[in-house]
Regions:
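Retroviral Gag capsid
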Residues: 1-94
Length: 94
């Protein structure tokens, strides 16, 4: 199973699909935290990787631990790359 890169496109569905593919891969290969985060961050490219590195640096400078839990990484990615109006539109549909 190939897991493709994520480079912060304008389409929020790209992130949702990317997360789903990674979760399928993690389950198939029986990969657990914190290796999930380390593998996922290698698949971030361009703006997404710059943002992730800056987030991790900011956390360290504020005395917090770097993110090492997959669920927290997913939350941060969604907050950054999925606009609230997209979430509201999905909520209205269902």
């Amino acid at each position: 199973m190939e897991v493709y890169n994520f480079s912060s496109t304008l389409n929020p569905k790209d992130l949702i699909d990317w997360i789903g593919k990674l979760e399928d891969y993690f389950e198939l290969e029986e990969i657990e935290d914190p290796l999930r985060v380390r593998l996922a961050q290698t698949k971030l490219k361009e703006h997404a990787t710059l943002w992730w590195k800056e987030l991790q640096i900011d956390r360290e400078e504020e005395g917090e631990l770097k993110i090492s839990r997959w669920r927290l990484m997913v939350t941060e990615l969604k907050e950054k790359f999925i606009p609230i109006d997209y979430v509201l539109e999905l909520f209205k549909r269902f």
